[in-house]
Amino acid sequence: TLFNLIAGNLKSSSGNVVFNNENITDTPSYELFSKGLLRTFQIAHEFTNLSVLENLMMVPGNQSGEKLMNALFKPSLIAKEENLIKEKAMEVVKFLNLSHLKNELAGNLSGGQKKLLELGRTMMVDAKLVLLDEVGAGVNRTLLKDLGTAIEKLNKEKGYTFCMIEHDMDFIG
């Protein structure tokens, strides 16, 4: 319920939700993305028929290619932007040790690999706060360790803040 309130999926009966000194109580969930507030879910969601790299490249919003006039009259701008997004996606797969899977269809990934991909999507927009909902659910011990290491590195090296719901106390500890 708390995550649903913060993420704009539920309306509070009283009080306010404040993020970065801004009242976001009535902000639709799709607008929170641009403010740097992201949420993951217990069951990872991905574009199953796209590769890991393509899934990451889908994340950044307001791309120049989304505007018809740019598509018609500024193809070089779109190509340049796409190259920058691809470079960032490559950095993310490397950071998460998913380079060997960058061309794999996301639908073929294991549950733990999908959770790493989901974490990678938060990296594509430099989230300020990531709400992790049972990030360890259904993940084997090996990938759970990788996931924990990635979360810790994102916090220490890149300044990400995480709020986590998790039942696996060994993972949290």
Question: Where does each model-flagged region fall?
Answer:
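Conserved ABC ATPase signature
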Residues: L105-L109
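Walker B catalytic motif
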Residues: E134-V135
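H-loop/switch region of ABC-family ATPase nucleotide-binding domains
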Residues: E166-H167
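Conserved ABC ATPase "signature" region
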Residues: M69-L101, A150-E152
